[in-house]
């Protein structure tokens, strides 16, 4: 039997008969590959990359060097893609999703910079980490720059719900980092605590990315 995934089924967004307030928007269809999903948003991903390059700019040379090094070090851009896919599924027609996708990538990249310093990592994705190349201090400070640049871009959108989602997400991510630090040498850590750490550290930003697309698409709270 073919594998299945849950995908948005746009014709059923109005909800089931008799209860239109509850959205009925998931349907089982044959599984799709990442390549097929990215093909749906190819032009949008190029637009996001252009926003990232533009908004990375700083008059401080070292900021540019470190930020460009980590941004260009590979990765699938899955979190930005999720913003674009969610917004597109809900019929969003503007360009704000490009900005928000870049914001999510900046936040993610900032966490990587900080992660590698905390973990004393020398390699990421087969390349020297930014802290191995430029030192811990530069990595931490450029991570801070990316966080603050992300919030500058957020404010420009002038949407309090978006600001709430992203500020909550960054706070939870920081808590996840501390939780991991507390438990990294604990051989008795249980499954519940492990799941809490990965929810805070990793899943929360994926959740926020999907929410941003829904907010831009003016989805109902139930869909969001």
What do the predicted segments below correspond to?
Residues 10-13:
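Leucine-biased recognition of intrinsically disordered, low-complexity hydrophobic segments
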Residues 2-3, 17:
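Compositionally biased, low-complexity intrinsically disordered regions
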Residues 36-47, 53-224:
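Mg2+-dependent prenyl diphosphate-binding active-site environment of isoprenoid biosynthetic enzymes
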Residues 16-31:
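Short, Lys/Arg-enriched N-terminal segments with co-localized hydrophobic residues
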């Amino acid at each position: 039997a073919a594998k299945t995934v849950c995908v948005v089924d746009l014709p059923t967004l109005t909800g089931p008969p008799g209860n239109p307030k509850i959205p009925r928007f998931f349907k089982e269809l044959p599984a799709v590959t990442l390549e097929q999903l990215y093909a749906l948003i190819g032009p949008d991903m190029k637009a996001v990359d252009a926003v990232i390059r533009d908004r990375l700019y700083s008059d401080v040379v070292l900021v540019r060097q470190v930020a460009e090094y980590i941004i260009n070090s590979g990765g699938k851009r899955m979190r930005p893609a999720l913003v674009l896919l969610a917004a597109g599924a809900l019929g969003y027609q503007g360009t704000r999703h490009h900005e928000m996708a870049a914001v999510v990538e900046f936040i993610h990249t900032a966490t990587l910079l900080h992660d590698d310093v905390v973990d004393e990592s020398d390699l990421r994705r087969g390349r020297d980490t930014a802290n191995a190349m430029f030192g811990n201090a530069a990595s931490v400070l450029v991570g801070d720059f990316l966080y603050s640049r992300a919030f500058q871009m957020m404010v420009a959108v002038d949407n309090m719900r978006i600001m709430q989602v992203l500020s909550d997400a960054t706070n939870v991510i920081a808590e996840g980092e501390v939780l991991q630090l507390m438990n990294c040498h604990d051989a008795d850590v249980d499954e519940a605590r492990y799941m809490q750490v990965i929810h805070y550290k990793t899943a929360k930003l994926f959740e926020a990315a999907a929410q941003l697309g829904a907010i831009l698409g003016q989805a109902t709270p139930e869909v969001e």
